[in-house]
Regions:
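Non-catalytic interaction/regulatory segments
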Residues: 1-103, 109-139
């Protein structure tokens, strides 16, 4: 186990406790701490994992789907778009919608998260806006 693998859960715990208060943060962390795979931990920072946990809690209690846009920082020109659902989803369900929004999909991955015997899914896309310059070049 490398250092980042060991520190990721601790960072998530601290972020959850800071954001939600010690008791609520600790409770949420305990519920999800073993739910995230090594692949998820490698791709998603603890800061965004908290956002994912809160959205997964929403769909668990409401039986709806939701989405979240994650901005990785100032020096990065792409975003991560997470779709949360109670069943696995396929690319053909998302690509037409993303293309209609003039978004370019750079990659995608689906995570399955099992918490309290319920499996939930996060479909994660790396996206960026398509350049509109080409359409204006003819003017």
């Amino acid at each position: 186990m490398n250092r980042s693998t060991k520190t990721w859960p601790i960072a998530l715990q601290r972020i959850a406790e800071r954001a939600l208060g010690e008791q609520a943060g600790q409770s949420l962390w305990q519920k999800y701490r073993a739910a995230f795979s090594a692949e998820y931990r490698a791709l998603v920072s603890p800061r965004y994992a908290l956002k994912d946990m809160l959205n997964l809690e929403r769909i668990t209690s409401s039986n709806n789907q939701c989405i979240s846009l994650l901005n990785p920082g100032r020096q990065v020109e792409h975003y991560r778009l997470h779709f949360y659902s109670r069943q696995p989803r396929y690319l053909d369900e998302y690509i037409p919608v993303l293309e209609n929004m003039h978004l370019r999909v750079m990659d995608q991955v689906q995570f399955s998260i099992t918490v309290d015997g319920i499996t939930l899914f996060i479909k994660s896309f790396t996206i960026k806006a398509k350049s509109q310059c080409a359409s204006f070049a003819k003017l």
